[in-house]
Amino acid sequence: ELFNSIKIDSSLKHLSTMLDTNGSAESSTWNKILPVTDGVMVDLKAFDDKVHQKLTGTSNVQVLQSIQYLHEVDKLFEVRLLIIPGWNDQESMLQKTAEWLSQQSTNISIKILGFRQHGVRSEYSHLQQATPEVLEKVSRTFHDFGFKRIQLV
């Protein structure tokens, strides 16, 4: 409703409407909100489904389908990768992730976020923080697959 209100109010039409999501919505849900959405930023916790399930409690199948669908309808603004050392920073996993995303498009904006312990729930406080060196390694992998729009956070 908020995005719809922004789009129909002439004094607010200049505002962009961007959605930050875990990507779990199905295409029927996307179809309801995309007409009033300028772009979508999707979090992909892990390309490997087993790792994704361990981290989030859910499969990544719908997340990957959402990324594909949003790209097809030209609403995918950015894919955000949360890098957690020992969980999803292995070179083989990074290459599989970069390869799959490059099959969608290398014009996708990639935001590489290093895991930080600040503000996380207690069950995740034992996870290791990502160092700048780890994030640089991830960036190089995506660069090697042709991605140009890579941001490290």
Where are these regions (language model features)?
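Class I S-adenosyl-L-methionine
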Residues: 68, 102, 136-143
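Conserved AdoMet/S-adenosylmethionine-binding subsite of the radical SAM
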Residues: 1-124
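A structural motif corresponding to the C-terminal lobe/cap of the Radical SAM core domain
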Residues: 125-141
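A cross-taxonomic marker for long C-terminal extensions/tails that follow the last structured domain
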Residues: 139-153
